[in-house]
Amino acid sequence: MSSGASFIFLFFFLTSFTASVENVFYIKHICPNTTTYSRNSPYLTNLRTLLSSLSAPNASYSTGFQSARAGQAPDRVTGLFLCRGDVSPAVCRNCVAFSINDTLVQCPSERKSVFYYDECMLRYSDQNILSTLAYDGAWIRMNGNISIDQNQMNRFKDFVSSTMNQAAVKAASSPRKFYTVKATWTALQTLYGLVQCTPDLTRQDCFSCLESSIKLMPLYKTGGRTLYSSCNSRYELFAFYNETTVRTQQAPPPLPPSSTPLVTSPSLPGKSWNSNVLVVAIVLTILVAALLLIAGYCFAKRVKNSSDNAPAFDGDDITTESLQLDYRMIRAATNKFSENNKIGQGGFGEVYKGTFSNGTEVAVKRLSKSSGQGDTEFKNEVVVVAKLQHRNLVRLLGFSIGGGERILVYEYMPNKSLDYFLFDPAKQNQLDWTRRYKVIGGIARGILYLHQDSRLTIIHRDLKASNILLDADMNPKLADFGLARIFGMDQTQENTSRIVGTFGYMAPEYAIHGQFSVKSDVYSFGVLVLEIISGKKNNSFYETDGAHDLVTHAWRLWSNGTALDLVDPIIIDNCQKSEVVRCIHICLLCVQEDPAERPILSTIFMMLTSNTVTLPVPLQPGFPVQS
C-alpha cells in the first residue's frame, strides 16, 4: 500500500471512531519507543485488525472487558480494554473509541502502549499480555496538596490502608475483579474506594497487584490513585463513582431456603415421587424468586419517559434524548398544574409536586417565559446540570419544552427547604445543634463538589436557606441552579453587568461591581451558616447595637468577645459551645471583605472536620449590600 493510500486509510479509520465520543477524561498514556514498526509493516495491519475488533459494535462493552489477538509472530499484536466497573456500556464504548483514536495519533509507530482514562484503559503489545500480571506503566496521583491533619495522619493512613485492602480481597474473589467500598471516617467525612483488575488475572495475581498499588498510594492525602496496566486503585473523600450502579452490582444474592437436608427413606410406594415433587417445588420457588428480582431490577433500569411511567436515569447515560420528558405526562402528574399541588415559587418560576402513575413523586419547576435563552442552549445546560451527581445536590431527572413551556423535573424532597424549619418558631426545635452541624457539613460538601470535585468548576451564585432542600432524613441538598455559571479550566473570575441573586447573601464585589468567583459562593456560605447558627434571617437584624444585618451583628459580637450571644436560644443549652464558636469563626473568615483572604471550600471543610487546624484571625467583613 502506498504511503498516500495508507494515510487516507488511517484518516478514515480514525474518523470512524469520533462520532459518538463524548465526555472522556484523559489521564495519561505510555508508549515507549524501544520497539517500533514502520508504516507499511505487517504489524500495523495486525494492529488495525486488533483495534477494529476491540471497537466493534458487538464488543463486550456490557462487561467492560475484552481482549483480542491478531496476526502471527513476530508481528502478532495482543490487546485489551478495561472499562471502570461502574460505567454504562455506552460510556465504555465511547471511551474505547476515544482511546483508539488517541492511540493512533499519540503512538503512531510504537509496538506497545497503554492509555489511561477516568472511564477506561486501552493496552496493546507485541508480547503476550493476556492473563499475565504486569506492574509496568505505573502512574501515581494524589488529590492536590490537601493533607490530612498531622495529628490524625497515622490513624487516617491505617484507616485507608485497611479499608482498601479489604476491598482488594473482595475484588480478587469476584468474577469481574472489581469492588467499591464506602466507610465513615468522621461525622462529616466518608471514604470512597474503588479497586479493579483485568478479569483475566487469577485471584492471587489480582490481589498481589492491588496490594502493591495500595502501598504506592499517598495515603496521607484526602485522595489518591495508582494505575498499573493490570490493575488500579483509588480513594477519595467524595463519591467519584456511580453509587447506584455499584449498589446493584454488589447487592448480596437472595438467601437460600432452609439448609435442612432432605432425608430419603427406603423405597416405599409414593415416597420417591413425593420427594421429587418437593425438590422440584423448592427449585422452582427459588428460580421464580430470582427471576422476579431480575425482572424488577431490569424494569427499574429501563423505565422510559412514557405516559405510564416515571423517568429513571443513570448519571453516565445522560443525554438530551434520555432527559426529555413528555409534557402531557408532567401535566397529568401535577393535576394540570393545580394550585393544590404548588409547593413553592421563586424568581424563576413556580414549583409543583407531581406524582407519576407508578407512584414516583417529583418536584416540577415551571420556568417563567422571560428568559431569552434558545432551546438548544437550554437543553445543553440541562444535560450539564443533570450530570452533577452528588448526595448533597438535588438530582435533576428530566425536562420538557412541550406546550410552549420549559419545565424541569427534580427528585422530590419531602421536608421542603431549610428556611421552612429554620425561621419558623414552631419548627425550629426540630433543628438541634447536632442536626444543624450535619446540615452545615452537607452544604459544604455540595459546594466543594461544584467548585473542585466535579469535572467543571461551577459557581452557584444563589446560595441561601430556601435553596437548601432537605430529604426524608434531613440531609441537605443544594438546589436551584438557575443562576449557576460554569468556569473554564483556568478561569478564576468573571464579570457581569446583570446582577442577579439574593441581596444579603451576595458578596460585596459581586453586588457592587458584578465580579463573581468561587469566593463569592464562599461569602454566601458564610452568611448562610450564620443564619443556621442564629436561627434568624440575615436581613432581620435591628439590634440595640445598631446592626441592620447578620454579618454586622456577628462581627460586633465577635469583636466584643460575646460570640455566643449570636447563638439561637433553642440550641444554646444543648450544644458544644467550643464547636459553635469555631463555626462562627469560620463564618467570619468566609465573609471577609477581601476575596483573596477568604478560604476556599476544601480548606473550609478541613476547618469544619478537624479541630486541630489553626484558624487565622478574621479581618474586617465585607458587609452585605441590601436591596
Curated annotation (Swiss-Prot):
Localization in the cell: Membrane
Main location class: membrane
Family: Belongs to the protein kinase superfamily. Ser/Thr protein kinase family. CRK subfamily.
Organism of this sequence: Arabidopsis thaliana (Mouse-ear cress)
Signal peptide boundaries: 1-20
Class of enzymatic activity (EC top level): transferase
Catalytic residue positions: D462 (proton acceptor)
Chain ranges passing through the membrane: 277-297
Entries under PROSITE patterns matching the protein: GNK2, PROTEIN_KINASE_ATP, PROTEIN_KINASE_DOM, PROTEIN_KINASE_ST
Protein name: Cysteine-rich receptor-like protein kinase 15
